[in-house]
Amino acid sequence: MVIMAMLSAVLMACGGNKTSATANGEQPLAGPDFNADSAWAFCLRQCQFGPRVMNSAAHDSCAQWIVSRFQQYGMTVSQQHATLKGYDGTSLNATNIIASFKPKATNRILICAHYDCRPWADNDADSANWQKPVMGANDGASGVAVMIELARLLSLNDSLDRGVDFVCFDAEDWGVPQWSDHQGDGSDTWALGAQ
């Protein structure tokens, strides 16, 4: 829901089409055409790497792909590397990816999603799947796909009068699984890359 609200704000602000006023004097909103097929392809490509579980080749390859897509669309990209500690003591090699449109602009829009996948399907109705990773198509990959599509649109029309920061958080999905006997509330084990 937050992504859709941000998407609407960006699309409305990106308008370059000439419009005429309505009967009450308000200008109709105009913006570039969001291409759902393009966003779908970006989501699919992430899933083709496999589950982007922390410390996996799929995770690292996907991160490199995300960086290259943002760079392809003219964004200024930086990465925040960190070694984080999971709830179970696992060292997690995390990389937040920040892609900026008009990085010198002082008025900015912030849009965020995460790209890592849950290593356990602990909410699956079938307990036989609890130890399997989640593909993360409708969670991490979809949000990142929308951000990449927005970056593509901004690369075609830079009339937006403010900057945009796209942040792809990492280590969001390593929270305590439901089947764990972990002591404590576990609330600080989620969204490690954003802490």
Regions found by a protein language model. Give the residues of each.
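Post-signal peptide N-terminal segment of mature Sec-exported envelope proteins
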Residues: 20-45
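Acidic/histidine-rich catalytic neighborhood of metal-dependent amide-processing enzymes
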Residues: 131-195
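Active-site-proximal beta-strand/loop segments in catalytic clefts of secreted hydrolases
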Residues: 46, 80-82, 101-103, 112-116, ...
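C-terminal motif of bacterial Sec signal peptides marking the signal peptidase cleavage site
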Residues: 10-13
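Loop/turn elements at helix/coil->beta-strand transitions in domains of secreted/extracellular proteins
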Residues: 73-75, 105-109, 160-165
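A non-catalytic alpha/beta surface segment that caps or lines the substrate-entry region
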Residues: 44-104
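Bacterial signal peptide processing site
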Residues: 15-18
